[in-house]
Amino acid sequence: MDIRNLKYVKQFISHNLINFKKKTYKNSNKILVEVYDYKPSTIPISYLSNILAQKYQANIVGYYSNFPSMKKKFKTLLEIFNPYDIKKIYKSFGVEKFIIPKKSKHTAVEVLFTKIFKKINTKEDVLDIKFDGIVFGDLIYDEFLRSSNRMTINITSKQFQYFLKDAISLYLFWKNIFKLENFKSVIISHHVYFMGFVSRIAIFKNIPVYSIGITNIQYLTKLNQSKHCAFKSYSEVFKKFDISLQKKLLIDAEKKLTNRFSGEKDIKLLMDRHTDRDFYNKNISTKKILSKNRFKVLISAHQFSDAVHVYGYKFLFDDFYEWIDFLGKCIEKTDYDWYIKFHPSEHEKNYKHINYFSKKYPKFKILPND
Protein backbone atom coordinates (compact mmCIF):
# COMPACT_ATOMS: atom_id res chain seq x y z
CA MET A 1 0.00 0.00 0.00
CA ASP A 2 1.19 3.49 -0.89
CA ILE A 3 2.11 5.14 2.42
CA ARG A 4 0.38 8.31 1.19
CA ASN A 5 -2.95 6.45 1.32
CA LEU A 6 -2.58 5.21 4.91
CA LYS A 7 -4.44 8.17 6.36
CA TYR A 8 -7.43 7.49 4.11
CA VAL A 9 -7.51 3.83 5.10
CA LYS A 10 -7.34 4.85 8.75
CA GLN A 11 -10.24 7.25 8.22
CA PHE A 12 -12.24 4.54 6.44
CA ILE A 13 -11.70 2.05 9.27
CA SER A 14 -12.75 4.67 11.81
CA HIS A 15 -15.83 5.44 9.72
CA ASN A 16 -16.76 1.75 9.63
CA LEU A 17 -16.33 1.25 13.36
CA ILE A 18 -18.65 4.18 14.01
CA ASN A 19 -21.31 3.43 11.38
CA PHE A 20 -21.38 -0.37 11.37
CA LYS A 21 -21.93 -1.40 14.96
CA LYS A 22 -20.84 -5.01 15.35
CA LYS A 23 -23.77 -7.33 15.95
CA THR A 24 -23.53 -11.09 16.29
CA TYR A 25 -26.61 -13.09 15.36
CA LYS A 26 -27.15 -16.36 17.20
CA ASN A 27 -28.18 -18.35 14.15
CA SER A 28 -26.53 -20.06 11.19
CA ASN A 29 -27.32 -17.36 8.62
CA LYS A 30 -24.27 -15.95 6.83
CA ILE A 31 -23.46 -13.38 4.16
CA LEU A 32 -20.44 -14.56 2.14
CA VAL A 33 -18.25 -11.66 0.99
CA GLU A 34 -15.19 -11.94 -1.27
CA VAL A 35 -11.99 -10.45 0.13
CA TYR A 36 -10.96 -8.19 -2.73
CA ASP A 37 -7.86 -6.13 -2.06
CA TYR A 38 -8.80 -3.12 -4.15
CA LYS A 39 -9.43 -0.43 -1.58
CA PRO A 40 -12.04 1.68 -3.48
CA SER A 41 -14.27 -1.39 -3.87
CA THR A 42 -14.29 -2.04 -0.13
CA ILE A 43 -16.48 1.05 0.31
CA PRO A 44 -19.57 -0.28 -1.53
CA ILE A 45 -18.79 -3.79 -0.25
CA SER A 46 -18.96 -2.57 3.35
CA TYR A 47 -22.37 -0.98 2.85
CA LEU A 48 -23.97 -3.78 0.83
CA SER A 49 -22.74 -6.52 3.18
CA ASN A 50 -24.23 -4.72 6.18
CA ILE A 51 -27.53 -4.08 4.41
CA LEU A 52 -27.77 -7.79 3.57
CA ALA A 53 -26.70 -8.81 7.09
CA GLN A 54 -29.51 -6.72 8.52
CA LYS A 55 -32.03 -8.03 5.99
CA TYR A 56 -31.25 -11.70 6.66
CA GLN A 57 -30.24 -11.31 10.33
CA ALA A 58 -26.94 -12.88 9.28
CA ASN A 59 -23.27 -12.73 10.24
CA ILE A 60 -20.75 -11.58 7.62
CA VAL A 61 -18.03 -14.02 6.53
CA GLY A 62 -15.12 -13.09 4.27
CA TYR A 63 -13.60 -15.51 1.78
CA TYR A 64 -10.61 -15.83 -0.53
CA SER A 65 -11.54 -17.18 -3.94
CA ASN A 66 -8.44 -19.27 -4.65
CA PHE A 67 -5.75 -21.32 -2.95
CA PRO A 68 -3.10 -19.04 -1.46
CA SER A 69 0.18 -19.04 -3.39
CA MET A 70 3.55 -18.93 -1.61
CA LYS A 71 3.72 -15.23 -2.47
CA LYS A 72 0.28 -14.70 -0.95
CA LYS A 73 1.18 -16.66 2.18
CA PHE A 74 4.27 -14.52 2.66
CA LYS A 75 2.24 -11.35 2.12
CA THR A 76 -0.31 -12.55 4.69
CA LEU A 77 2.49 -13.11 7.18
CA LEU A 78 3.73 -9.55 6.68
CA GLU A 79 0.21 -8.18 7.09
CA ILE A 80 0.33 -9.14 10.77
CA PHE A 81 2.52 -6.08 11.25
CA ASN A 82 0.30 -3.82 9.12
CA PRO A 83 -2.41 -2.07 11.18
CA TYR A 84 -4.37 -1.30 8.02
CA ASP A 85 -4.19 -4.51 5.98
CA ILE A 86 -7.21 -5.77 4.02
CA LYS A 87 -8.38 -8.15 6.76
CA LYS A 88 -8.50 -5.34 9.30
CA ILE A 89 -10.54 -3.26 6.86
CA TYR A 90 -13.04 -6.11 6.48
CA LYS A 91 -13.19 -6.67 10.23
CA SER A 92 -13.95 -2.97 10.69
CA PHE A 93 -17.29 -3.34 8.89
CA GLY A 94 -18.32 -6.56 10.61
CA VAL A 95 -16.57 -9.56 9.05
CA GLU A 96 -16.16 -12.14 11.81
CA LYS A 97 -14.12 -14.85 10.13
CA PHE A 98 -12.42 -15.68 6.85
CA ILE A 99 -12.60 -18.78 4.66
CA ILE A 100 -9.35 -19.73 2.90
CA PRO A 101 -9.56 -22.61 0.36
CA LYS A 102 -7.62 -25.78 1.13
CA LYS A 103 -6.70 -28.57 -1.27
CA SER A 104 -9.24 -31.40 -1.38
CA LYS A 105 -8.43 -35.07 -0.82
CA HIS A 106 -6.24 -36.48 -3.58
CA THR A 107 -8.46 -39.52 -4.25
CA ALA A 108 -11.62 -37.48 -4.82
CA VAL A 109 -9.76 -35.15 -7.18
CA GLU A 110 -8.28 -38.03 -9.20
CA VAL A 111 -11.66 -39.72 -9.60
CA LEU A 112 -13.31 -36.59 -10.97
CA PHE A 113 -10.25 -35.71 -13.08
CA THR A 114 -10.33 -39.12 -14.81
CA LYS A 115 -14.03 -38.73 -15.53
CA ILE A 116 -13.64 -35.20 -16.93
CA PHE A 117 -10.35 -35.52 -18.80
CA LYS A 118 -11.37 -38.52 -20.90
CA LYS A 119 -14.06 -36.33 -22.47
CA ILE A 120 -11.60 -33.61 -23.48
CA ASN A 121 -10.51 -34.00 -27.10
CA THR A 122 -10.54 -30.35 -28.18
CA LYS A 123 -10.20 -26.92 -26.61
CA GLU A 124 -13.94 -26.48 -27.08
CA ASP A 125 -14.42 -29.48 -24.78
CA VAL A 126 -12.56 -27.56 -22.06
CA LEU A 127 -15.11 -24.75 -22.33
CA ASP A 128 -17.91 -27.28 -21.88
CA ILE A 129 -16.55 -28.73 -18.61
CA LYS A 130 -19.29 -29.15 -16.01
CA PHE A 131 -19.20 -30.20 -12.38
CA ASP A 132 -22.52 -31.50 -11.06
CA GLY A 133 -24.37 -29.86 -13.94
CA ILE A 134 -22.74 -26.43 -13.49
CA VAL A 135 -20.58 -25.00 -16.30
CA PHE A 136 -17.07 -24.11 -15.12
CA GLY A 137 -15.14 -24.63 -18.36
CA ASP A 138 -14.90 -20.98 -19.35
CA LEU A 139 -13.64 -20.03 -15.88
CA ILE A 140 -11.01 -22.79 -15.98
CA TYR A 141 -9.93 -21.84 -19.51
CA ASP A 142 -9.48 -18.16 -18.63
CA GLU A 143 -7.75 -18.80 -15.30
CA PHE A 144 -5.22 -21.06 -17.04
CA LEU A 145 -4.41 -18.45 -19.70
CA ARG A 146 -4.18 -15.69 -17.11
CA SER A 147 -2.07 -17.50 -14.53
CA SER A 148 0.39 -18.85 -17.11
CA ASN A 149 0.29 -15.85 -19.51
CA ARG A 150 -0.52 -18.08 -22.47
CA MET A 151 -2.45 -17.40 -25.66
CA THR A 152 -4.17 -20.75 -25.82
CA ILE A 153 -4.41 -24.19 -24.22
CA ASN A 154 -2.52 -27.34 -25.12
CA ILE A 155 -4.89 -29.97 -23.72
CA THR A 156 -2.19 -32.68 -23.78
CA SER A 157 0.34 -30.71 -21.74
CA LYS A 158 1.18 -31.80 -18.21
CA GLN A 159 0.88 -28.20 -17.08
CA PHE A 160 -2.76 -28.05 -18.12
CA GLN A 161 -3.53 -31.43 -16.56
CA TYR A 162 -2.04 -30.38 -13.22
CA PHE A 163 -3.97 -27.15 -13.47
CA LEU A 164 -7.24 -28.96 -14.15
CA LYS A 165 -6.70 -31.02 -11.01
CA ASP A 166 -6.29 -27.80 -9.03
CA ALA A 167 -9.54 -26.50 -10.52
CA ILE A 168 -11.32 -29.70 -9.50
CA SER A 169 -9.85 -29.48 -6.02
CA LEU A 170 -11.07 -25.89 -5.68
CA TYR A 171 -14.56 -26.87 -6.81
CA LEU A 172 -14.75 -29.75 -4.33
CA PHE A 173 -13.68 -27.41 -1.53
CA TRP A 174 -16.43 -24.89 -2.28
CA LYS A 175 -19.00 -27.60 -2.90
CA ASN A 176 -18.37 -28.88 0.62
CA ILE A 177 -18.44 -25.37 2.14
CA PHE A 178 -21.85 -24.68 0.60
CA LYS A 179 -23.12 -27.96 2.06
CA LEU A 180 -21.94 -27.04 5.55
CA GLU A 181 -22.90 -23.36 5.67
CA ASN A 182 -26.20 -21.50 5.41
CA PHE A 183 -25.33 -18.65 3.06
CA LYS A 184 -28.19 -16.22 2.54
CA SER A 185 -26.40 -14.07 -0.01
CA VAL A 186 -23.02 -13.76 -1.74
CA ILE A 187 -21.03 -10.67 -2.75
CA ILE A 188 -18.31 -11.04 -5.40
CA SER A 189 -15.92 -8.68 -7.17
CA HIS A 190 -15.73 -10.48 -10.53
CA HIS A 191 -17.56 -13.34 -12.22
CA VAL A 192 -14.50 -14.51 -14.22
CA TYR A 193 -11.48 -16.77 -13.55
CA PHE A 194 -11.51 -18.89 -10.38
CA MET A 195 -13.22 -15.91 -8.72
CA GLY A 196 -16.37 -17.07 -10.51
CA PHE A 197 -16.52 -20.51 -8.87
CA VAL A 198 -18.35 -19.28 -5.78
CA SER A 199 -20.94 -17.31 -7.73
CA ARG A 200 -21.69 -20.22 -10.10
CA ILE A 201 -22.34 -22.56 -7.16
CA ALA A 202 -24.43 -19.97 -5.31
CA ILE A 203 -26.54 -19.15 -8.37
CA PHE A 204 -27.14 -22.87 -8.96
CA LYS A 205 -28.41 -23.11 -5.38
CA ASN A 206 -30.68 -20.06 -5.88
CA ILE A 207 -28.67 -17.96 -3.43
CA PRO A 208 -28.77 -14.22 -4.31
CA VAL A 209 -25.43 -13.10 -5.79
CA TYR A 210 -24.28 -9.51 -6.21
CA SER A 211 -21.27 -8.46 -8.27
CA ILE A 212 -19.99 -5.15 -6.95
CA GLY A 213 -17.55 -2.52 -8.19
CA ILE A 214 -16.73 1.07 -7.37
CA THR A 215 -19.49 2.47 -9.61
CA ASN A 216 -22.11 -0.27 -9.96
CA ILE A 217 -23.79 -3.39 -8.58
CA GLN A 218 -25.29 -6.24 -10.59
CA TYR A 219 -27.67 -8.93 -9.39
CA LEU A 220 -26.67 -12.22 -11.02
CA THR A 221 -29.10 -15.02 -11.90
CA LYS A 222 -29.13 -18.31 -13.81
CA LEU A 223 -30.12 -16.44 -16.96
CA ASN A 224 -27.68 -13.58 -16.37
CA GLN A 225 -24.48 -14.85 -14.72
CA SER A 226 -22.29 -12.03 -16.05
CA LYS A 227 -21.80 -8.61 -14.47
CA HIS A 228 -22.20 -7.25 -18.00
CA CYS A 229 -25.65 -8.79 -18.43
CA ALA A 230 -27.37 -5.40 -18.11
CA PHE A 231 -26.09 -4.40 -21.55
CA LYS A 232 -28.54 -6.85 -23.12
CA SER A 233 -31.54 -4.89 -21.88
CA TYR A 234 -30.22 -1.37 -22.49
CA SER A 235 -32.36 -0.77 -25.59
CA GLU A 236 -35.54 -1.94 -23.87
CA VAL A 237 -34.85 0.18 -20.79
CA PHE A 238 -34.04 3.19 -22.97
CA LYS A 239 -37.44 2.95 -24.70
CA LYS A 240 -39.17 3.42 -21.33
CA PHE A 241 -37.67 6.91 -20.87
CA ASP A 242 -39.65 9.92 -22.10
CA ILE A 243 -38.53 11.49 -25.37
CA SER A 244 -36.94 14.56 -23.76
CA LEU A 245 -34.76 12.40 -21.49
CA GLN A 246 -33.78 10.16 -24.42
CA LYS A 247 -32.57 13.21 -26.35
CA LYS A 248 -30.53 14.46 -23.39
CA LEU A 249 -28.94 11.04 -22.90
CA LEU A 250 -28.06 10.72 -26.60
CA ILE A 251 -26.41 14.14 -26.57
CA ASP A 252 -24.46 13.19 -23.44
CA ALA A 253 -23.41 9.85 -24.99
CA GLU A 254 -22.24 11.56 -28.18
CA LYS A 255 -20.18 14.01 -26.12
CA LYS A 256 -18.55 11.18 -24.16
CA LEU A 257 -17.72 9.23 -27.31
CA THR A 258 -16.23 12.33 -28.92
CA ASN A 259 -14.08 12.93 -25.86
CA ARG A 260 -12.97 9.30 -25.83
CA PHE A 261 -11.89 9.27 -29.48
CA SER A 262 -10.15 12.62 -29.12
CA GLY A 263 -8.02 11.25 -26.29
CA GLU A 264 -9.62 13.16 -23.43
CA LYS A 265 -9.43 11.54 -20.01
CA ASP A 266 -12.78 10.28 -18.77
CA ILE A 267 -13.96 8.20 -15.84
CA LYS A 268 -13.51 4.93 -17.76
CA LEU A 269 -9.91 5.67 -18.69
CA LEU A 270 -9.11 6.84 -15.18
CA MET A 271 -10.37 3.53 -13.78
CA ASP A 272 -8.57 1.32 -16.32
CA ARG A 273 -5.29 -0.38 -15.59
CA HIS A 274 -2.01 1.36 -16.38
CA THR A 275 -0.93 0.93 -20.00
CA ASP A 276 2.64 2.23 -19.79
CA ARG A 277 1.73 4.84 -22.39
CA ASP A 278 0.60 8.45 -22.38
CA PHE A 279 -2.31 8.81 -24.79
CA TYR A 280 -2.96 12.42 -23.94
CA ASN A 281 0.04 14.35 -25.24
CA LYS A 282 -0.43 16.65 -28.21
CA ASN A 283 2.69 15.64 -30.11
CA ILE A 284 1.94 14.95 -33.75
CA SER A 285 4.08 12.29 -35.40
CA THR A 286 5.19 12.68 -39.01
CA LYS A 287 6.46 9.13 -39.16
CA LYS A 288 5.03 7.25 -42.15
CA ILE A 289 3.53 3.93 -41.15
CA LEU A 290 0.94 3.02 -43.78
CA SER A 291 1.88 2.21 -47.35
CA LYS A 292 -0.05 3.87 -50.18
CA ASN A 293 -2.36 2.65 -52.91
CA ARG A 294 -3.36 -0.69 -51.41
CA PHE A 295 -6.46 -1.87 -49.59
CA LYS A 296 -5.74 -1.91 -45.87
CA VAL A 297 -7.04 -4.09 -43.04
CA LEU A 298 -6.53 -3.11 -39.40
CA ILE A 299 -6.75 -5.75 -36.67
CA SER A 300 -7.22 -4.35 -33.17
CA ALA A 301 -6.08 -7.27 -31.07
CA HIS A 302 -7.24 -8.13 -27.57
CA GLN A 303 -5.05 -8.81 -24.56
CA PHE A 304 -4.59 -12.54 -25.10
CA SER A 305 -4.93 -13.69 -21.48
CA ASP A 306 -7.38 -11.14 -20.07
CA ALA A 307 -10.72 -12.86 -19.32
CA VAL A 308 -11.12 -14.19 -22.85
CA HIS A 309 -14.66 -15.45 -22.22
CA VAL A 310 -15.91 -12.59 -20.06
CA TYR A 311 -18.90 -12.09 -22.40
CA GLY A 312 -19.62 -15.80 -22.90
CA TYR A 313 -17.94 -18.78 -24.55
CA LYS A 314 -20.07 -19.81 -27.52
CA PHE A 315 -18.30 -17.85 -30.24
CA LEU A 316 -16.64 -18.52 -33.61
CA PHE A 317 -13.22 -19.02 -31.98
CA ASP A 318 -12.22 -20.67 -28.71
CA ASP A 319 -9.81 -17.87 -27.80
CA PHE A 320 -8.04 -14.80 -29.19
CA TYR A 321 -5.11 -16.90 -30.44
CA GLU A 322 -7.43 -18.91 -32.71
CA TRP A 323 -8.91 -15.67 -34.06
CA ILE A 324 -5.56 -14.04 -34.90
CA ASP A 325 -4.23 -17.31 -36.31
CA PHE A 326 -7.26 -17.58 -38.60
CA LEU A 327 -6.69 -14.03 -39.84
CA GLY A 328 -3.02 -14.85 -40.40
CA LYS A 329 -4.05 -17.64 -42.75
CA CYS A 330 -6.38 -15.24 -44.57
CA ILE A 331 -3.41 -13.04 -45.40
CA GLU A 332 -2.09 -15.63 -47.84
CA LYS A 333 -5.30 -15.37 -49.88
CA THR A 334 -5.29 -11.58 -50.34
CA ASP A 335 -3.06 -8.84 -51.72
CA TYR A 336 -4.11 -6.40 -48.99
CA ASP A 337 -1.91 -4.68 -46.45
CA TRP A 338 -2.70 -6.22 -43.06
CA TYR A 339 -1.86 -4.16 -39.99
CA ILE A 340 -2.17 -5.41 -36.45
CA LYS A 341 -2.30 -3.18 -33.37
CA PHE A 342 -1.77 -5.12 -30.16
CA HIS A 343 -3.61 -4.16 -27.02
CA PRO A 344 -1.72 -1.50 -25.00
CA SER A 345 -2.70 -3.04 -21.67
CA GLU A 346 0.17 -5.11 -20.25
CA HIS A 347 2.00 -4.65 -23.54
CA GLU A 348 5.31 -6.00 -22.27
CA LYS A 349 3.56 -9.11 -20.97
CA ASN A 350 2.04 -9.56 -24.41
CA TYR A 351 5.30 -9.02 -26.27
CA LYS A 352 6.25 -12.67 -26.67
CA HIS A 353 2.87 -13.27 -28.32
CA ILE A 354 3.49 -10.39 -30.71
CA ASN A 355 6.84 -11.89 -31.69
CA TYR A 356 5.21 -15.27 -32.26
CA PHE A 357 2.72 -13.93 -34.79
CA SER A 358 5.20 -11.64 -36.54
CA LYS A 359 7.44 -14.67 -37.19
CA LYS A 360 4.63 -17.05 -38.16
CA TYR A 361 2.98 -14.53 -40.49
CA PRO A 362 5.64 -12.10 -41.80
CA LYS A 363 3.02 -10.27 -43.88
CA PHE A 364 1.47 -8.96 -40.67
CA LYS A 365 2.62 -5.37 -40.29
CA ILE A 366 2.94 -4.76 -36.55
CA LEU A 367 2.01 -1.19 -35.63
CA PRO A 368 4.11 0.44 -32.90
CA ASN A 369 2.65 0.60 -29.41
CA ASP A 370 2.60 4.39 -29.39
Predicted features, each with a name:
Residues 262-360, 366:
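Conserved catalytic-core segment of nucleotide-activated headgroup transferases in glycan assembly
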Residues 34-38, 63-67, 188-192, 301-303, ...:
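Structural motif
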Residues 369-370:
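Conserved active-site histidine-acidic residue motif and adjacent donor-binding/catalytic loop
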Residues 35-45, 306-312:
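A short, glycine/small-residue-rich beta-strand->loop->alpha-helix junction that serves as a flexible
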Residues 1-30, 51, 55-168, 214-277:
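Conserved N-terminal ligand/cofactor-binding loop architecture of enzyme catalytic domains
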Residues 39-62, 317-331:
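Histidine-anchored nucleotide/phosphate-binding helix
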Residues 170-224:
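Conserved nucleotide-sugar donor-interacting segment of glycosyltransferase catalytic cores
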Residues 59-60, 207-210, 216, 338, ...:
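Hydrophobic beta-strand scaffold residues
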